[in-house]
């Protein structure tokens, strides 16, 4: 059974917490489906080309229908002309969102969490707190303390998951390139897969692993 590594206040290993048995044997295809769903939902639908009705000009017939020796033409906005409208071009009213049901979302999250635990990259701490926030409340101090926490983990990049994240914690991590801090309500399978390691507050971990199959 996979286990999360429990860290003390100095970020040293002091124990472990088991993941529920239902996390075993989940199909990885659920994570694939969720990643496709997530990326499609954040896709910016900005590509747009003008069709022949939207191109300016073309109010008169460019040349006589007969007698010129050229192919007949009714408007210079036709797609056959340079500067004319585009046929079958991109439109900005397309919906790229891919549907995924609640069960698949849950299974994708559980699979991603299980993968992190198997790789020994899932850590649990009592509290993700930045020292001195009451006394100093300065962004420079907050960032320095947050960076100390990140460096102590000795990980390439890290996702920090808080329960009821406060503004000081968010500010502290906001300028650090290789880590991200989020509230547990924002946690999803894509973020779990995107970061090489995950640090969760104990209450956030318990909230995530509780059985939601009946919800």
Swiss-Prot record:
GO biological process terms, semicolon-separated: translation
Source taxonomy: Bacteria, Pseudomonadati, Campylobacterota, Epsilonproteobacteria, Campylobacterales
Region span, Disordered: 46-76
Organism annotation: Helicobacter acinonychis (strain Sheeba)
Keyword Cell cycle (UniProt): no
Record's keyword annotation contains RNA-binding: yes
GO cellular component: ribonucleoprotein complex; ribosome
Molecular functions per Gene Ontology: rRNA binding; structural constituent of ribosome
Protein name, UniProt field: Large ribosomal subunit protein uL4
Function: One of the primary rRNA binding proteins, this protein initially binds near the 5'-end of the 23S rRNA. It is important during the early stages of 50S assembly. It makes multiple contacts with different domains of the 23S rRNA in the assembled 50S subunit and ribosome. Forms part of the polypeptide exit tunnel.
Family label: Belongs to the universal ribosomal protein uL4 family.
Keywords, alphabetical: Ribonucleoprotein, Ribosomal protein, RNA-binding, rRNA-binding
Subunit structure: Part of the 50S ribosomal subunit.
Biased composition (Gly residues): 56-71
